[in-house]
Amino acid sequence: MAAPEAWRARSCWFCEVAAATTMEATSREAAPAKSSASGPNAPPALFELCGRAVSAHMGVLESGVWALPGPILQSILPLLNIYYLERIEETALKKGLSTQAIWRRLWDELMKTRPSSLESVTCWRAKFMEAFFSHVLRGTIDVSSDRRLCDQRFSPLLHSSRHVRQLTICNMLQGATELVAEPNRRVLETLASSLHTLKFRHLLFSDVAAQQSLRQLLHQLIHHGAVSQVSLYSWPVPESALFILILTMSAGFWQPGPGGPPCRLCGEASRGRAPSRDEGSLLLGSRRPRRDAAERCAAALMASRRKSEAKQMPRAAPATRVTRRSTQESLTAGGTDLKRELHPPATSHEAPGTKRSPSAPAATSSASSSTSSYKRAPASSAPQPKPLKRFKRAAGKKGARTRQGPGAESEDLYDFVFIVAGEKEDGEEMEIGEVACGALDGSDPSCLGLPALEASQRFRSISTLELFTVPLSTEAALTLCHLLSSWVSLESLTLSYNGLGSNIFRLLDSLRALSGQAGCRLRALHLSDLFSPLPILELTRAIVRALPLLRVLSIRVDHPSQRDNPGVPGNAGPPSHIIGDEEIPENCLEQLEMGFPRGAQPAPLLCSVLKASGSLQQLSLDSATFASPQDFGLVLQTLKEYNLALKRLSFHDMNLADCQSEVLFLLQNLTLQEITFSFCRLFEKRPAQFLPEMVAAMKGNSTLKGLRLPGNRLGNAGLLALADVFSEDSSSSLCQLDISSNCIKPDGLLEFAKRLERWGRGAFGHLRLFQNWLDQDAVTAREAIRRLRATCHVVSDSWDSSQAFADYVSTM
């Protein structure tokens, strides 16, 4: 009887508190109470009024509310604001109560957006609080507009920050300045421990102050925090200074900006102990580099970039772009001769004794040893029909820009992250591609490194880097490649539509250098682009040779290689060490996905990759075309002989109408567990003869678990033929079937369901029916799906079959 007595005591306490708080409420709160009490639903309105009164005084009553019995607490939960609702979560769970429905309703009412159908929301509280944090940070939500969001006792940013797992920074770096402000120190400290993914979308040009704030933010979140992934999306015209800032900070480099406050965490960490050398010490290079050559080549690269920008945007306002430190100021230590070459005395604004800023990490010898071969390839980031222009040193250029004023940034990432090259005699002309990659007629190899990072520090770096639709200039590509060569903590790299062009060769060299580093963790590479200077299979071979420890490789090229047109001027081909004919060594690939451009692919090249990938478990070929069915058969035979661990095989957008014997060969493979033929025109020829052969092969295969046949014009006849796979005399263990986009009508689906019922095989897993002609007879379709759900899990949609008119006409 103790429990009921406690419940009654708590209930009486709640009523007493509610009555007292109601009497103490203001007239504004009391007026609605009278009107509510007089209505036909007086008891619920009164209880709700009491609950609102308790919610309004939670600062005093919180501990008592937490101790309320479960039924009463369950009625109060929807009346709490988001701050107390979040705080009471643990107590509610102990009482067997869930707040997920409340958070979902808050999402629908306040966020007014529908989550993606591909997103599986496991915790609506975390999702709401994360979105709420972003809206408050950007100023896109007014917390005073709704009582559920407004409470003077709580800071919206601080209270929601611990739920933020990913943060998106957009446009003009909105939110970066607010987060690093002193009043939000606790917010930033909380983010440093909770945030895992940092995303940048649609970035625009930013000023120096915004970049300085971003520098501090990245330092706190990456170097002293838990951020492990940085992703950049949709940046059509990347600002070089900002892009290189994000890259270098992600790689673990830190150098405070001019006039910026010192890092408190760095001071605490370094107090009482000597600095240690971590895995990044390989980047620091020699303590006495040849600065003259480095500075000379860096100055030439930067001068060329300024000249190119001036031509492209002659009317751009100076205030809208981040000014660069003057070349003369950044190269003070290079000597007076170099000063005179780069700037006339009239343009010098450097104070005596200015210290030269440190420079970027030195490339490893394996990366720099082959850079001389780049003279054969253009350095542009996209296909160039014209040869690159040549330029002279900037001596005597009156338009050279310098940094002026006390607010100018004297320490810039440009000062210590750039590729350097060997030495050239004064007065000689240099191509920008040769300067950028250091191909200077085989000069001293020691000149191919970078100046040491004497004043910069190395901290923890991210493990996942993603660049989506971010065009990379030569300068940006060189910076990325140089950082990659020693980025041993990197585990996954995604480069999607970045316009690499011939810079892909530098990327391969940097990946080869990274693979040679002790402790290299790179295991996943995703590469896609419109064009490639190498055919996709040669590029795949080069990547596999450069990264033998890679586990996941996804590569896609939309258009044929330039090498397919040898008549293009300047198309001299890749360096010989990139496309060597030597046999590919054994690698660790487990997953290989390839998207091919139009044109027949040489089967022997693909077979050579497959033979070296004995651990391959998943293979996906998209839009692959072979010269003949025999070539396709050669690939399948290679899979059977050399890839014994292969479990999943996928073909998409391939014409396999003439490869029916090869398809049967696959279906008889007793090692494959899942096969996908997506839009492969399987039943375009001889369907009456091929379908029985296909069903017979599947009935004898006891290892195949999943078969996906979307977009193959199966039709009702083909579906009914497939039903025989589940007959009583079948040894098939198929449990997943995808027959989407196959011109299936309701009557055929109903007959398919009846046959499954008749054979009584029981539930066989999942059946996918997207985009079929089920709307032609809605009643029959519902009956068919009802019957099917007794034997399997059905996933369908309401699709307008009139969209398939063209497909229907093509089958007439």
From Swiss-Prot:
<feature type="modified residue" description="Phosphoserine">
    <location>
        <position position="357"/>
    </location>
</feature>
<feature type="modified residue" description="Phosphoserine">
    <location>
        <position position="155"/>
    </location>
</feature>
<dbReference type="GO" id="GO:0016020">
    <property type="term" value="C:membrane"/>
</dbReference>
<feature type="repeat" description="LRR 2">
    <location>
        <begin position="518"/>
        <end position="530"/>
    </location>
</feature>
<comment type="subunit">
    <text>Part of an E3 ubiquitin-protein ligase complex with Elongin BC (ELOB and ELOC), RBX1 and CUL5. Component of a probable ECS(LRRC41) complex which contains CUL5, RNF7/RBX2, Elongin BC and LRRC41. Interacts with CUL5, RNF7, ELOB and ELOC.</text>
</comment>
<keyword id="KW-0433">Leucine-rich repeat</keyword>
<comment type="pathway">
    <text>Protein modification; protein ubiquitination.</text>
</comment>
<protein>
    <recommendedName>
        <fullName>Leucine-rich repeat-containing protein 41</fullName>
    </recommendedName>
</protein>
<feature type="region of interest" description="Interaction with Elongin BC complex">
    <location>
        <begin position="45"/>
        <end position="54"/>
    </location>
</feature>
<feature type="modified residue" description="Phosphoserine">
    <location>
        <position position="373"/>
    </location>
</feature>
<feature type="repeat" description="LRR 6">
    <location>
        <begin position="701"/>
        <end position="728"/>
    </location>
</feature>
<feature type="modified residue" description="Phosphoserine">
    <location>
        <position position="276"/>
    </location>
</feature>
<keyword id="KW-0677">Repeat</keyword>
<feature type="modified residue" description="Phosphothreonine">
    <location>
        <position position="327"/>
    </location>
</feature>
<feature type="compositionally biased region" description="Basic residues">
    <location>
        <begin position="387"/>
        <end position="401"/>
    </location>
</feature>
<dbReference type="GO" id="GO:0005634">
    <property type="term" value="C:nucleus"/>
</dbReference>
<feature type="repeat" description="LRR 4">
    <location>
        <begin position="613"/>
        <end position="635"/>
    </location>
</feature>
<feature type="repeat" description="LRR 3">
    <location>
        <begin position="531"/>
        <end position="555"/>
    </location>
</feature>
<dbReference type="GO" id="GO:0005829">
    <property type="term" value="C:cytosol"/>
</dbReference>
<keyword id="KW-0833">Ubl conjugation pathway</keyword>
<dbReference type="GO" id="GO:0005737">
    <property type="term" value="C:cytoplasm"/>
</dbReference>
<feature type="modified residue" description="Phosphoserine">
    <location>
        <position position="326"/>
    </location>
</feature>
<feature type="repeat" description="LRR 5">
    <location>
        <begin position="636"/>
        <end position="659"/>
    </location>
</feature>
<feature type="repeat" description="LRR 1">
    <location>
        <begin position="487"/>
        <end position="507"/>
    </location>
</feature>
<dbReference type="GO" id="GO:0016567">
    <property type="term" value="P:protein ubiquitination"/>
</dbReference>
<dbReference type="GO" id="GO:0042802">
    <property type="term" value="F:identical protein binding"/>
</dbReference>
<feature type="region of interest" description="Disordered">
    <location>
        <begin position="267"/>
        <end position="408"/>
    </location>
</feature>
<dbReference type="InterPro" id="IPR032675">
    <property type="entry name" value="LRR_dom_sf"/>
</dbReference>
<comment type="function">
    <text>Probable substrate recognition component of an ECS (Elongin BC-CUL2/5-SOCS-box protein) E3 ubiquitin ligase complex which mediates the ubiquitination and subsequent proteasomal degradation of target proteins.</text>
</comment>
<keyword id="KW-0597">Phosphoprotein</keyword>
<feature type="compositionally biased region" description="Low complexity">
    <location>
        <begin position="354"/>
        <end position="381"/>
    </location>
</feature>
<dbReference type="InterPro" id="IPR026137">
    <property type="entry name" value="Leu_rpt_41"/>
</dbReference>
<feature type="repeat" description="LRR 7">
    <location>
        <begin position="731"/>
        <end position="752"/>
    </location>
</feature>
